[in-house]
């Protein structure tokens, strides 16, 4: 059985928290895209964990985690992430962590170029709000066939050295002539690769074969997405997107088994909206600065990977309905409902008003989205602590009505409702 856990919005919806909860019923959890540019935060009895590269299932001792070929992997960051997990008592070995030999390596020059380009663009206000982790440049070089893959670390021979020389020669045309930097050293990059070859070679394998055999044997496999539908390179708010496909249809492809079909798609969405980075974010126009500050503080809305304050706003039903459609959701998980406990009234964006005076509940693109204004519906708040509730019928009537109203607006059943950061702070509806 293949299940995808994906984000409905801009990312930061709480996917890691839900993967950690639901993975107790799965054998394998696989990441299929992205790099270390976003963090999945999980809290359990052992403390707080922020996972950037490793699937959230790693916190379950009986789960095997897979880093798929659709990912871009910075070995330096992966080493630190493994060390941080190990320090907290999480056991990691090639038995429970497998890295695709097809995954792209994020090299030091990718990270450097990302920072330099964002700095250059910021001088004219044209920056994208990059995390400066080298993600776009890793994917760009992947498609231009000018980088190495994790499988190359297993065979560090003369042919790999020759390819690296060609890659560095090409990269130096940019680093020296555009950014005025010192040339990248082939010897330094080779030594860097050798270091991580020794460290990660035992983890690197053909994960496609592993996943196919597991699926054939009836194992339950969960695909864990990074970011959300609105950050998808094709279906997101271009160019303010990530550089990979975050949608569920890509999950089997990026994980390593492109011929297999999903049995279940579970979308994760917040009870309100948040966003890191540049680009149109219509829902934030529906709140005063003071109200946004209050929501940000109650929700602790700061990027898990960057620490940057997130932009916030009411639940955006227009964007969420589009995200549900993009992800082909069978059911939804609504996270952070408890964050709204303090509100007397809870705003919801139900439509967008366009410059021609019309309103729409369809998510627009381009200039139409840039100029859209939110249409807001106010719902009664419940103004009490719901963090201890474990049954839907025990929620205050206003909270139940809020959940059912969101279901109506996005057109999909909400099965899971998280009411706190702890592993068991979740309501499961029949």
PLM feature spans:
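Non-transmembrane, aqueous-exposed alpha-helical and coiled segments at domain scale
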Residues: 1-430
């Amino acid at each position: 059985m293949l299940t995808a856990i994906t984000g409905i919005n801009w990312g930061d919806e709480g996917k890691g928290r839900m993967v950690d909860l639901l993975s107790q019923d799965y054998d394998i959890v696989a990441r299929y895209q992205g790099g270390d540019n976003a963090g999945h935060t999980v809290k359990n009895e052992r403390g707080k964990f922020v996972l950037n590269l490793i699937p959230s299932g790693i916190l379950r001792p009986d789960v095997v985690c897979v880093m798929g070929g659709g990912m871009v992997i910075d070995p330096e960051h992966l080493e630190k992430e493994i060390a941080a997990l190990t320090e907290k008592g999480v056991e990691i070995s090639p038995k429970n962590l497998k890295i695709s030999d097809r995954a792209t390596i994020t090299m030091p020059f990718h990270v450097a170029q990302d920072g330099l380009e964002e700095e250059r663009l910021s001088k004219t206000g044209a920056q994208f709000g990059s995390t400066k982790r080298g993600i776009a440049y890793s994917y760009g070089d992947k498609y231009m066939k000018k980088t190495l893959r994790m499988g190359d670390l297993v065979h560090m021979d003369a042919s790999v050295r020759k390819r690296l020389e060609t890659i560095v020669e090409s990269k130096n045309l940019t680093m020296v002539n555009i950014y005025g930097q010192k040339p990248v050293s082939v010897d330094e990059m080779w030594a860097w690769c050798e270091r991580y070859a020794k460290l990660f070679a035992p983890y690197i394998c053909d994960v496609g074969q592993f996943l196919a055999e597991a699926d054939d044997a009836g194992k339950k496999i969960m695909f864990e997405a990074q970011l959300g539908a609105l950050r998808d390179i094709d279906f997101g708010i271009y160019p303010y997107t990530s550089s990979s496909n975050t949608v569920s249809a890509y999950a089997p492809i990026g994980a390593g088994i492109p011929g297999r079909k999903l049995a279940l798609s579970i979308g994760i969405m917040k009870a309100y909206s948040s966003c890191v980075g540049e680009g149109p974010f219509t829902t934030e126009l529906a709140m005063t600065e003071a109200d946004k500050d209050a929501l940000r503080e109650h929700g602790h809305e700061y990027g898990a990977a960057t620490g940057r304050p997130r932009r916030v706003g009411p639940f955006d039903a227009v964007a969420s309905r589009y995200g549900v459609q993009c992800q082909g959701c069978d059911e939804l998980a609504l996270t952070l409902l408890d964050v709204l406990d303090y509100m007397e009234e809870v705003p919801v964006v139900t439509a967008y008003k366009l410059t021609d005076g019309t309103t729409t509940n369809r998510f627009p693109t381009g200039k139409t989205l840039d100029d859209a204004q939110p249409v807001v519906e106010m719902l009664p708040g419940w103004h009490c602590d719901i963090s201890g509730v474990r049954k839907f019928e025990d929620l205050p009537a206003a909270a139940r009505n809020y959940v059912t109203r969101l279901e109506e607006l996005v057109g999909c059943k909400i099965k899971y409702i998280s009411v706190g950061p702890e592993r068991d702070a979740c309501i499961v509806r029949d």
